[in-house]
């Protein structure tokens, strides 16, 4: 970069001077170079990253560099398997807006854990009716004080391969979430917004419930399946779009299923049930047509149901038609799944959303390089250095299926509270024991951990500060077992020291119990004897000065 009014040579000299000054400060004040701590939520991610190569590509299990991006917004999206779209449940949140405070409690968020629970057998098949039944029958639903997380979790997420199935909902008005490129969607279900409402009367309440949308596509074709022929489903009465409850001994209801294209695997196919608006995953490898366990609330159902519902009081002689409250259906994914819409990821779909989304797992940006190559350590300079690092995306070396299976366990952190280091020695010993036991369990899943701990920590501090990649060297040296043994020995040593000190005559708890009653009356006397003469002298001097001043004034 050339500064205005200066020659390139002067600029180069100035940059060198600034660099030397910065290096001098770093060497003179080492605390300025102290590495930043690793975020706790990345602990399990790093350990899991070490186990990924051995699970899918043994050639990457050792003697290689794995680099993890520490940017909080840059993630890689891995498309979920076909079974995840049919078996992954979503949580239903009903947000109620009350206009009559004397009839209903204040606005609150109600979360249905299981609408098929025996504690509420009379709950209707429609969400709005279910909410009214809860209030009319004085049932106590689970109240979730924490609202769902709306808004994008990440904004720079990339998907390296095409997703097998996307869901698109386009409307002129709504909350835009983002659109995935058509080249990244093998097949897209287009949801058409409904134009009619279903009305149901319960007691004095009249419900206006949004009708189910339709699927606008010409690529789907009707197929014959056990689901399509009207298979009995135990949760059939819980679905919000069925006209009436259906018991197990009632005749099966015909339903039309549409087949989504799946050229990768002909033995498995994904079906869309337009009657119940569910996705079915069917395995055709056996003669019995194995059917995956279905969830009553699937991501497809959630995407179509995310809208607003209105409820009005029916006209009676004692009241006039009014609008006591409205219902807003909101859905959130569970089990570590996310909605990817464009380059942003979401856990929850807001009401009246618009865009093109798919289901993905999230993983940090991971790359690998040959262990024989030397990776330069980033230096803290005024100008960003252009580093040419031969990094290859991890998705190229690992299979997507193996990565998806491994990442489905979710991301969890192994963290130790700061208050542990302020606790007595016995609590500190117990925490070290817990850490050693945790590492022992993780060692069964991880082939090798980072051996060059000090070098990695120094590089890690700069990587977090500069928001760049952090590389860990993988080996099979057994360093973890040595550290575990040291931790256990240290915990035992601390426990013995704490026990010996507590039993010794110099322990504070042994002699303070009889010393304090003696010292409590002696301390005030000692303070009085120490400061009493000084205070008495000051008071006497003050009185003499005042008397002298009054005498002089009178004369």
From Swiss-Prot:
Low expression in testis. Gene3D superfamilies: 1.10.287.210. InterPro entries: TLV/ENV_coat_polyprotein. The record marks 387-388 as: Cleavage. It is found in: Virion. Specific enzymatic cleavages in vivo yield the mature SU and TM proteins. One of its GO terms (cellular component) is plasma membrane. Keywords: Cell membrane, Cleavage on pair of basic residues, Disulfide bond, ERV, Glycoprotein, Membrane, Signal, Transmembrane, Transmembrane helix, Transposable element, Viral envelope protein, Virion. Glycans are attached at residues 47, 222, 265, 283, 352, 370, 475. Coiled coil: none annotated. The chain crosses the membrane at residues 516-536. Pfam families: TLV_coat. Residues 1-35 form the signal peptide. Residues 537-555 are cytoplasmic. Residues 388-408 are annotated as: Fusion peptide. A motif (CXXC) lies at residues 64-67. Residues 36-515 are extracellular. Orthologs in P.troglodytes, G.gorilla (truncated) and P.pygmaeus (truncated). The surface (SU) and transmembrane (TM) proteins form a heterodimer. SU and TM are attached by noncovalent interactions or by a labile interchain disulfide bond. Retroviral envelope proteins mediate receptor recognition and membrane fusion during early infection. Endogenous envelope proteins may have kept, lost or modified their original function during evolution. This endogenous envelope protein has lost its original fusogenic properties. Belongs to the gamma type-C retroviral envelope protein family. HERV class-I H env subfamily. This is HERV-H_2q24.1 provirus ancestral Env polyprotein. It comes from Homo sapiens.
